[in-house]
Amino acid sequence: PQDTSSAASDVYKRQVSNAIYNSDIPVICCCDGFVIGAGFFLPCSSDIVLATKNSYFQMPGINFDVLVGSAHLGRLVPKQKVREMVLTGEKVSVEHIFSYGGISSIHDNKESMMLRANELAKKICSMERDSIKVLKKILNSNEVIDVNRAFKQEQQLTFQNKKNLSD
């Protein structure tokens, strides 16, 4: 039998991720410390990502037979790095993600990161709201992969894999 609490949790994660990604309002994500597993979906679904220097990123799902995350991760790092991260479950430094352009800026502490986030938010809020909405739609439609569809497929394949492993 399928673990319904796990299935419900995965549906919720997908809904949250989709809500962030599909929001009409640009989402700025601030990362401080561990960005692991399901927590990785937040920056991967956001429009702008900031982080402190003590942050690191990890997709350890392979260690638990959870096979999701690659679609979203592709928004922060190139496809070969996605493969390495999801196949090994190893952690990656904030500097590494920054070198690929997945993080806009690295900050010494939370305070300076939040100041930058507020500066960016004020600048975006000063723009014409309807133009921002249209631009968000354009940016999302320019994605090479439909992360919403891919995430759902990853979850379905994970459930099937877990079922096969338990049989």
Predicted segments with their positions:
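Single conserved hydrophobic/aromatic residue that forms the stacking wall/gate
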Residues: 1-8, 12
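Well-ordered beta-strand positions
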Residues: 47-48, 84, 88-90, 96, ...
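Conserved donor-binding/catalytic loop of nucleotide-activated donor transferases
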Residues: 7, 23-25, 45-46
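CoA-thioester-processing core
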Residues: 16, 20, 30, 36-86, ...
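C-terminal long alpha-helix characteristic of the crotonase
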Residues: 50-55, 103-151
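Terminal peptide-recognition signature
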Residues: 26, 43, 97, 135
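Glycine-rich phosphate-binding loop at the start of an alpha helix
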Residues: 10, 14, 37, 67, ...
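Short alpha-helical scaffolding segments that buttress acidic/His motifs in well-ordered protein cores
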Residues: 85-89, 135-139, 154, 158
